Amino acid sequence: MDSYAPTQALNEAKTNADPDRFWAVGFPLLAVLIFLMSTHQGIGILPDSARYMNMAATPWDAPVYAAMLQLVALTGIDIVAGAWGIGLVLSGLNAFLTWHILRVASGRATYAAMGTALVVIAPQTVALYGLAMSEPPFLTAILATLLAFLRYVQSGDRRWLIAVGVGIGVASLVRFTGPALGAAMALFLIIDPRHDAKRRVADVARILIPSAVIFLGWAAIAAEVSGRSTGRPLEWLGNMTAREWWLSFNALAAWIVSDELPAVMRRILFLMAMSASLFILVRHGRSVLGRAANGNAEASLIAIPLGFFFFTYLGFMVLATAIETNLHLNGRYAYPIYCTSIMAVTIAMAQVNIADPVIRWLHRALIGLACLMLVSHGIRSTVRVHQAWQEGVGFASLDWARSPTLAAVDRLPRDAVIYSNGSDAIGYVLRRPARDIPAPFMLRTGRDDPNFPYRVQLAGAQAALARGNTYVVFLNRIDWRFYMASEQELIRLLRLVPVAKLEDGTIYKGSIKEERQQ
């Protein structure tokens, strides 16, 4: 019997390794397949995408994704093709990292597979990975930071905390919400029972110093070189009302099931799921911290900073909405904590002791909810992928490619000056520069631009129109830029006359009388 034991152990290890390999390869392949189908008409382009690609009049803010695109473009590769390539790589990489972290931290392949599936096939994931946006690289930075933190928890090697700090600094330059991850990590280090108070403070410093040097160093250099860094004044300019907060809550409730279900049902399911998840996370946290105090450090400790991240991120977003005008906590901004919350609950559920009847009942309820979410996610994501396959997304959609107004703009002289409410659409579809039409106030502040006041914008546009070979283009599909002057207002103030009126827009120029007077 003793001679057989090593062989039996090897066979069991091989049996356990086989499903691990399957999921480690299967999830990245699934993510890549979804990406390829979603970008059948080209990677989706939204207004922020055009900013990252320098195809819009408004510059980008956080620099990392824009730098990635520009570095690819320097090789001679088309920048849009570069964005597609980056998206392809990150879709597979992030799926693998999610699986790997969950597998190591949970210790159970079935739970890790369930958690990874809830991330990979989520409609938010499908939508955002099919776009040239900063969310995929932001999640890569988060996952890489979590992986470094996991190595620290397992080994106790404090050099990994330096890597964590670097990861947080980089994440903060991908999206400015990155510091919330650092706050979550710091909270865990402060309560880590394995070390005394002096060591805990020193460990917090190990992640704080490199992350602060990276972020603040960039901000100082950017302000010196370009005169701007985060692109936001540090003032209390937020204007979210109770209605906007309610809409933000509804965006979070859509994590669970489709918007097509009654709103009351979605809200109740979300609150029940959050309450049950928090209960299990707290129970798991108390248990695993107790074992850590006795010198038994487990990988599942990482569920604690993941749980903290939900609150630090929401706190950061509340602060951001208080500072910036017209900023709402929509599905895009909430996406990172969807992923990390799923990971936290997955790890806790895999490790929590279900001997307690209450925990056992909640555990079963959450498993049932996860199955419901998988079905809902699968249906919604299939619909999204099918629509993206047929029509494309954003400015890369067939509607924009077939726009009669853009076709007419493309026939204008190549040296013509163009003002438009859709300078980004013109920049992407036609690959020619365009300026924004005058705006009475700025989107982020609700105030007139102190560096380029509305009256100066109007005077500049009027002078350009008077010189001739200047056109103002209004695209009817762009109806969300309420901070820009209306079409009727500019017709009156700039004395515009129509050159071409088409089904999806109008092209204007200055009046001949005005030009002759100049």
What is each residue range found by the language model?
Residues G85-S106, T140, A144-A148:
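Transmembrane-helix motifs of polytopic, lipid-linked glycan transferases
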Residues Y4-P6, R151-S155, L181-A212, G285-A292:
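Perimembrane helix-loop-helix junctions
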Residues H40-Y52, T58-L71, I77-A81, V225-T230, ...:
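Extracytoplasmic catalytic/substrate-binding loops of multi-pass membrane glycan-assembly enzymes
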Residues G130-P137:
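Short acidic/glycine- and proline-prone juxtamembrane loop motifs at membrane-interface regions
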Residues P28, T110, L208-A212, A299, ...:
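Signature aromatic-anchored transmembrane alpha helix within multi-pass, membrane-resident enzymes
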Residues S49-A56, F149, L366-G427, P450-A466, ...:
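Membrane-embedded, lumen/periplasm-facing catalytic core of multi-pass transferases
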Residues K14, V104-S106, T145-L161:
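Membrane-interface transmembrane helices that cradle and orient dolichyl/undecaprenyl
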Residues I34, Q41, A202-R283, L306-M317, ...:
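Membrane-lumen/periplasm interface segments of specific transmembrane helices
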